[in-house]
């Protein structure tokens, strides 16, 4: 696991119109989040905070249990989740893209399944409230409908009645 450092800084890159995380002299993470999506605090306090570091490590340790991703992928997922949680403005719910979950098994994990008219895919819940959850797309590309898609790690808010549990046999089939 890449250890968080007080030297890490969030960078608002006008050239790329993206939020970057400067990890060291040789490494930067380019997020899919555009500058207009960022909170004002991103511009005022660019340092990776203790709160950022704690959340990053919590997400990393949670995801490692699934044994689905290599350490570099875990780091990338965790850092993008941290950016969404602390650097993005609130996103509006766009639940109409997703089918309601009508099953009886409740979702108890933060890695969930969402199903659009075009496909099903895995998402990570970054923030949860009683009505809705902010999630990031874990697939390379997730087709919402014929015209719209989400790039990897793009955030979307959905009503909780759209959240499908990730079934254990699905997880085990990916591990094998």
Curated annotation (Swiss-Prot):
Keywords: Cell cycle, Cell division, Cytoplasm, Septation. Contributes to the efficiency of the cell division process by stabilizing the polymeric form of the cell division protein FtsZ. Acts by promoting interactions between FtsZ protofilaments and suppressing the GTPase activity of FtsZ. It comes from Pseudoalteromonas translucida (strain TAC 125). Interacts directly with FtsZ. It is found in: Cytoplasm. Belongs to the ZapC family. Pfam families: ZapC_C, ZapC_N. One of its GO terms (cellular component) is cytoplasm. This is Cell division protein ZapC. One of its GO terms (biological process) is division septum assembly. It comes from the Bacteria. The gene is zapC.
């Amino acid at each position: 696991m890449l250890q968080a450092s007080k030297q890490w800084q969030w960078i608002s890159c006008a050239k790329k119109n993206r939020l970057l995380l400067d990890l060291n002299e040789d490494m930067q993470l380019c997020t899919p989040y555009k500058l207009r999506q960022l909170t004002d605090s991103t511009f005022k306090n660019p340092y990776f905070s203790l709160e950022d570091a704690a959340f990053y490590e919590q997400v990393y340790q949670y995801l490692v249990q699934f044994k689905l991703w290599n350490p570099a992928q875990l780091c990338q997922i965790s850092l993008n989740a941290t950016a969404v949680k602390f650097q993005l403005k609130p996103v509006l719910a766009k639940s109409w893209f997703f089918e309601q979950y009508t099953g009886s098994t409740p979702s108890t994990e933060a890695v969930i399944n969402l199903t659009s008219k075009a496909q099903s895919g895995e998402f990570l819940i970054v923030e949860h409230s009683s009505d809705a959850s902010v999630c990031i797309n874990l697939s390379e590309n997730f087709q919402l409908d014929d015209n719209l898609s989400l790039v990897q790690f793009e955030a979307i808010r959905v009503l909780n009645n759209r959240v499908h549990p990730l079934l254990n046999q699905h997880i085990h089939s990916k591990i094998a």
